Structures are given as structure tokens and as C-alpha cells.
């Protein structure tokens, strides 16, 4: 479980602009000294923007050996432990980018590790990535496998038996429109990619969940968002849950029982599927009528369980206990724990020395 630290961001552009004004100031009357002479010995020092090295965005755990864990950080690269967290080593420092969105390990081959770059959260300090990376030797070496224009990859899911097949959730540019958003699929280990779900240039996908019993069935959380220098627009009519049953060839937007069924802007959505019964799907949905939702028929209909959804634009992760479909966790500034499927929550189960939980994995 992660504890995130925050730092003050100071706009470097504003500092450079101020210096530029001094250089471009009028020189005044003839005979005055050139103002650039006063700057010739000026030494620059870095004062920002700050990067979030301490914030953890995701875990990748080898399920056959949970002592092996990969951790992806907001701006500190990828770290690996082979002794259940006693010691850690950086394994991504030689790559061109250090901001991580998601880590996925192939269930059929734990040596195959995928990293999606670009922090998926929406802070002004969130750094953008340059695509998706693949390791065939458990993190010793990496190869960039494309998707550079996606900027932020929120989730990667891999076929349980064929490590060549995977899907990537692409959020796209945080600060403006771009077409490289949605869901991308590869069937050849990343050599080629197809954009199998595209909604529009403003709506990306923040989360994907794959049916463990039928891997051609997937749920995608579409998310319309836009950061500006002085604000954030975290929602729109095209956000929502989309479902495919044919490996991404066709998709439909799920609506029945969800808060946006009758309209209204929808924000960020988190998804999870119960491992013992894939009919059961949970979602936390940002909406004026949002909260925690449950489906018992693979997403065809939904029931609102409660209003809890802690600061969805910054968290929005929900996890189901693998042995109890009524025991769920929602992450936020505190850890929210429910024993009744999300009707009620307690924040007393987990104590922390610092707020903010962004990632969780349950054995």
C-alpha cells in the first residue's frame, strides 16, 4: 500500500519569462551600459517544477511468487523487490522516462513485464510518458514498444494464457486534445497495435478490467478530462463504462442502472471483477448521483450500493477481496473498507502515517 508525498510546484516558465523581460527591457539613452552585461555571469539554478518521486501509482506482483513485486512511481521510475519488500532496486533508470502509469506481469510467464508510462492522475504536477515498454527478462532490460503519443497509460491487462495479447488504456494528453486515446490492442507482443476503442479526441480510457473466465470480455472506463493552468474539467457526457465480448472488435456503452443513464456529466471510473464469479463487477463512478455500483450479470444491469467515492479525480481504485464478493476496498486519502458490498465503509481498518492511497494488490 502506498503512502504518497507531495511537493510544492513552482512554474519554471514564469521564472524564464521574468528573466526574458529583463533582457528585452528598453536600453534607454545613449551612453548607458548594456543591461545584458549585468547578466553575463548569472548562474541558473533549478527551482522547479517539482516531480513526485514518492507517489506510487501501481504494483505488479508475481502471483506465483508474491515475494517479487514491481512498483511504479509518479516520477521515480520502476523499483523491484525479490524479498517481499525488505530491499529494493531501481530497474528502469536507463530508460528515457521515469513517470509510470501501470505495471503488468504476464500470468503465463512472469519474466514478461510491461510498463505503461505517464502518471494517470490529474495533478498539475503529473508528468507525461512516452509510451509502453516491455521486458522479457524480469526487468533486467527493456524495449520501447510504441504508443508514444498516448501520453498517459492508466492500465495494462494481459491475456491469461497468451502473453502476446494485451490491451492498454490510453488517457491521452492531460492538457489538450489528441486522437491517440482509448484502448489499444496487440496480438504480437507489441510489434503492432490497433486502436480498438476510440470515442473522441477529448475522451480517453483510465481503467480496463478483463474477465478472468472469458478474456475476450473486457470493461473499459472512458474518461473525458482536461487540465488547465487554473483549473480542471474532470468529466463529460462521453465518459462511461464500455464493454466488449469479442476481444475489442465491437463495444457497447453500459447504462442500465448507472448514474449517467438519464444524462449528466460523468468523471473518472474505477473497475474490478470478482475472481471467483466474473458475473460480479464493481465500479466507482464520479457523477452528481455517483458512488459505488455493483452488477451481478456481467455489467448488463447495475445497482447503486452507496454514495462513497473518495475524490475520484485523484484516486478511483476499487478492489474486491478474492474470497468474498461483499468485502471491498476503495482507495483515497484514507483506506475505505466495506464488509457489505459498499453499503457502509470504515476507515479504521488501516492506519497510516500519511494520507493518500493510490494502489492496492490483494493476494
Regions found by a protein language model. Name each.
Residues 27-363:
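Beta-propeller blade termini and top-face loops
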Residues 9-26:
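Bacterial N-terminal signal peptides
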Amino acid at each position: 500500500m502506498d503512502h504518497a508525498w507531495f511537493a510544492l510546484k513552482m512554474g519554471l516558465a514564469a521564472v524564464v519569462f521574468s528573466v526574458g523581460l529583463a533582457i528585452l527591457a528598453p536600453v534607454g539613452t545613449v551612453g548607458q551600459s548594456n543591461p545584458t552585461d549585468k547578466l553575463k555571469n548569472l548562474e541558473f539554478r533549478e527551482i522547479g517544477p517539482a516531480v513526485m518521486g514518492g507517489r506510487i501509482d501501481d504494483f505488479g506482483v508475481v502471483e506465483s511468487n508474491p515475494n517479487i513485486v514491481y512498483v511504479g512511481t509518479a516520477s521515480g521510475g520502476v523499483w523491484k523487490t525479490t524479498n517481499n519488500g525488505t530491499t529494493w532496486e531501481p530497474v528502469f533508470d536507463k530508460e528515457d522516462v521515469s513517470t509510470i502509469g501501470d505495471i503488468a506481469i504476464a500470468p503465463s510467464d512472469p519474466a514478461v513485464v510491461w510498463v505503461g508510462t505517464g502518471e494517470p492522475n490529474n495533478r498539475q504536477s503529473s508528468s507525461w510518458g512516452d509510451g509502453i515498454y516491455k521486458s522479457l527478462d524480469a526487468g533486467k532490460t527493456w524495449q520501447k514498444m510504441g504508443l508514444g503519443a498516448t501520453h498517459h497509460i492508466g492500465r495494462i491487462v494481459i491475456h491469461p494464457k497468451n502473453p502476446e495479447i494485451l490491451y492498454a488504456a490510453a488517457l491521452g494528453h492531460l492538457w489538450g486534445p489528441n486522437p491517440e486515446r482509448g484502448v489499444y490492442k496487440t496480438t504480437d507482443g507489441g510489434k503492432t497495435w490497433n486502436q480498438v476503442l476510440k470515442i473522441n479526441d477529448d475522451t480517453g480510457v483510465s481503467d480496463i478490467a478483463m474477465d478472468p473466465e472469458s478474456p475476450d470480455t473486457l470493461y473499459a472506463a472512458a474518461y473525458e478530462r482536461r487540465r488547465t493552468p487554473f483549473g480542471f474539467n474532470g468529466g463529460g457526457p462521453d465518459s462511461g463504462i464500455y464493454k466488449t465480448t469479442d476481444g475489442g472488435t465491437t463495444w457497447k456503452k453500459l447504462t442500465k442502472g448507472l448514474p449517467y443513464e438519464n444524462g449528466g456529466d460523468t468523471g473518472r471510473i474505477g473497475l474490478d471483477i470478482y475472481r471467483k464469479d466474473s458475473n460480479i463487477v464493481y465500479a466507482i463512478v464520479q457523477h452528481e448521483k455517483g458512488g459505488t455500483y455493483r452488477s451481478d450479470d456481467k455489467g448488463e444491469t447495475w445497482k447503486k450500493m452507496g454514495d462513497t467515492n473518495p475524490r475520484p479525480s485523484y484516486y478511483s481504485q476499487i478492489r474486491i477481496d478474492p474470497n468474498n464478493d461483499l468485502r471491498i476496498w476503495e482507495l483515497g486519502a484514507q483506506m475505505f473498507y466495506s464488509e457489505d458490498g459498499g453499503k457502509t465503509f470504515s476507515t479504521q481498518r488501516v492506519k497510516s502515517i500519511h494520507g493518500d492511497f493510490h494502489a492496492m494488490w490483494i493476494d
